[in-house]
């Protein structure tokens, strides 16, 4: 009872100090870079020294609840070993996990040897070290497992989308790394390398992107969402397997949530239940994704994971002209479920800019009533578009005018977000513009949990 009173007291205090920029289109003018893509000889693309040294090391959650980690890397000269040696900071006894190796071809490109190994039965809230490679080219990294799932478990997620490998991309990643909020896991909302923008989908750019992001993703998990630039369906060069490079390189624990595809799945982490959806896989009635999501939402236990977060690539609400209403078909299928199950927030990318919505829904339409305008709905999620991480150096600045009522704040700049869960009732979201100091919040808002504290948090 004392804990509940304390939470309510905190809720009352935070209710008074909500800070945000509601109903605003920012007039901030960003500086432009003359050169957009970082050249292949950039230091961030540097190949680690040594024969067959592991590179492009990255990790992601390897099970449903955070007690496993998928370790992935590439060796270029020969297969080497897919074994991972790991140990906890508290106990130096090394264990070994064995994985699998694969390769692929794409047009005239042959991949290196891609390794995926899952380490299991990890302890919660523990620092682990791990090593990959053999003999003189062994490389060592570390990560911290999440706390056990629970009602009032604090945890901080970073939000990055449409990263690419431009100079702006590098600024975004540096800002995230230097943030005083210290994100613990990245929720990545799609469009990774943009290799498909280069001649013949030059897959060398998958390798450079893997080396570029290693400085973060080798040390904390990134939760992957597939975007349109991962599709790489290119019949003109006889490449007709959708998502081929992405699927070989980036594994996710989709089977742990009874999904039949790596493009939609869920995980639990700390106090959040995170659902990843695919904007570019079938989602109509009766499709595998539709059927899975219907069952998945029923399984969410807000008494265990109070925060319900959805990730997708194409936004359902967007007031920029670019990609305007592209998410409409998915919205008509899933929005009513988001309202019914009181999803707290939906993060998307695709649009190369930032936008935060009010809590709105557009689910009242019937052919007899003509109601087709979004209305305020405190059971609905906030929709945040954060596809502004840098891509290939192009920002989407052409906005729908006048600003729709559902749009609370929007700005055509590059940046990243932070979703900082405090307890079962409150979380703080901030968006950080690249051209500000790392501690400056260009937009911020307190979230009140839709299940535990469903008061009006409009801005």
UniProtKB/Swiss-Prot annotation:
<feature type="binding site">
    <location>
        <position position="191"/>
    </location>
    <ligand>
        <name>Fe cation</name>
    </ligand>
</feature>
<feature type="modified residue" description="Blocked amino end (Gly)">
    <location>
        <position position="23"/>
    </location>
</feature>
<feature type="binding site">
    <location>
        <position position="350"/>
    </location>
    <ligand>
        <name>Zn(2+)</name>
    </ligand>
</feature>
<feature type="glycosylation site" description="N-linked (GlcNAc...) asparagine">
    <location>
        <position position="170"/>
    </location>
</feature>
<feature type="binding site">
    <location>
        <position position="162"/>
    </location>
    <ligand>
        <name>Fe cation</name>
    </ligand>
</feature>
<dbReference type="InterPro" id="IPR041792">
    <property type="entry name" value="MPP_PAP"/>
</dbReference>
<dbReference type="InterPro" id="IPR039331">
    <property type="entry name" value="PPA-like"/>
</dbReference>
<feature type="binding site">
    <location>
        <position position="228"/>
    </location>
    <ligand>
        <name>Zn(2+)</name>
    </ligand>
</feature>
<dbReference type="Pfam" id="PF00149">
    <property type="entry name" value="Metallophos"/>
</dbReference>
<keyword id="KW-0479">Metal-binding</keyword>
<dbReference type="InterPro" id="IPR008963">
    <property type="entry name" value="Purple_acid_Pase-like_N"/>
</dbReference>
<protein>
    <recommendedName>
        <fullName>Fe(3+)-Zn(2+) purple acid phosphatase</fullName>
        <ecNumber>3.1.3.2</ecNumber>
    </recommendedName>
</protein>
<dbReference type="GO" id="GO:0003993">
    <property type="term" value="F:acid phosphatase activity"/>
</dbReference>
<feature type="binding site">
    <location>
        <position position="194"/>
    </location>
    <ligand>
        <name>Fe cation</name>
    </ligand>
</feature>
<dbReference type="GO" id="GO:0008270">
    <property type="term" value="F:zinc ion binding"/>
</dbReference>
<dbReference type="InterPro" id="IPR004843">
    <property type="entry name" value="Calcineurin-like_PHP_ApaH"/>
</dbReference>
<dbReference type="Pfam" id="PF14008">
    <property type="entry name" value="Metallophos_C"/>
</dbReference>
<dbReference type="GO" id="GO:0005576">
    <property type="term" value="C:extracellular region"/>
</dbReference>
<feature type="binding site">
    <location>
        <position position="191"/>
    </location>
    <ligand>
        <name>Zn(2+)</name>
    </ligand>
</feature>
<feature type="signal peptide">
    <location>
        <begin position="1"/>
        <end position="22"/>
    </location>
</feature>
<feature type="binding site">
    <location>
        <position position="352"/>
    </location>
    <ligand>
        <name>Fe cation</name>
    </ligand>
</feature>
<comment type="subunit">
    <text>Homodimer; disulfide-linked.</text>
</comment>
<keyword id="KW-0378">Hydrolase</keyword>
<feature type="active site" description="Proton donor">
    <location>
        <position position="323"/>
    </location>
</feature>
<dbReference type="Pfam" id="PF16656">
    <property type="entry name" value="Pur_ac_phosph_N"/>
</dbReference>
<feature type="glycosylation site" description="N-linked (GlcNAc...) asparagine">
    <location>
        <position position="423"/>
    </location>
</feature>
<comment type="similarity">
    <text>Belongs to the metallophosphoesterase superfamily. Purple acid phosphatase family.</text>
</comment>
<keyword id="KW-0408">Iron</keyword>
<keyword id="KW-0732">Signal</keyword>
<feature type="glycosylation site" description="N-linked (GlcNAc...) asparagine">
    <location>
        <position position="136"/>
    </location>
</feature>
<feature type="glycosylation site" description="N-linked (GlcNAc...) asparagine">
    <location>
        <position position="238"/>
    </location>
</feature>
<keyword id="KW-0325">Glycoprotein</keyword>
<keyword id="KW-0862">Zinc</keyword>
<feature type="glycosylation site" description="N-linked (GlcNAc...) asparagine; partial">
    <location>
        <position position="108"/>
    </location>
</feature>
<dbReference type="InterPro" id="IPR029052">
    <property type="entry name" value="Metallo-depent_PP-like"/>
</dbReference>
<dbReference type="GO" id="GO:0008199">
    <property type="term" value="F:ferric iron binding"/>
</dbReference>
<keyword id="KW-1015">Disulfide bond</keyword>
<dbReference type="InterPro" id="IPR025733">
    <property type="entry name" value="Purple_acid_PPase_C_dom"/>
</dbReference>
<keyword id="KW-0964">Secreted</keyword>
<feature type="binding site">
    <location>
        <position position="313"/>
    </location>
    <ligand>
        <name>Zn(2+)</name>
    </ligand>
</feature>
<dbReference type="InterPro" id="IPR015914">
    <property type="entry name" value="Purple_acid_Pase_N"/>
</dbReference>
